[in-house]
């Protein structure tokens, strides 16, 4: 769910930027847990080569979800040595999700219904999240600045 324009939060030096289930505090840390539900990519030769490599990795890891394959190949030396791609992981403070919700509604740009099994569970918690956002947006500027606001989710998605 998009709450505000995320483009100001993208890294200008990165070719490929991806949201995280869990962010470790460093956007360069390859040990971050990527979530392929939200990706910002610059179209260039590096990213084209990277996507070809990622796509063919399905042959190396048959039956594996694309996100799980990415978790395997992100350590492959081919990516750094041959593509030259600059990969950055997006901070959950701005690009949160049910795994690690953004705690500051003054910062959050997007929230993802990740770490949640079942469509009904996702829809329920997304509705709650939207209601939380509406309550936050109804606050005055002073209330937003002085009163910490956070989500009441996840509830069904735990």
Whereabouts are the PLM-identified features?
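Catalytic core and acceptor-binding pocket of nucleotide-sugar-dependent glycosyltransferases
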Residues: 41-158
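GT-A fold catalytic core of metal-dependent nucleotide-sugar glycosyltransferases
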Residues: 1-33, 38-43
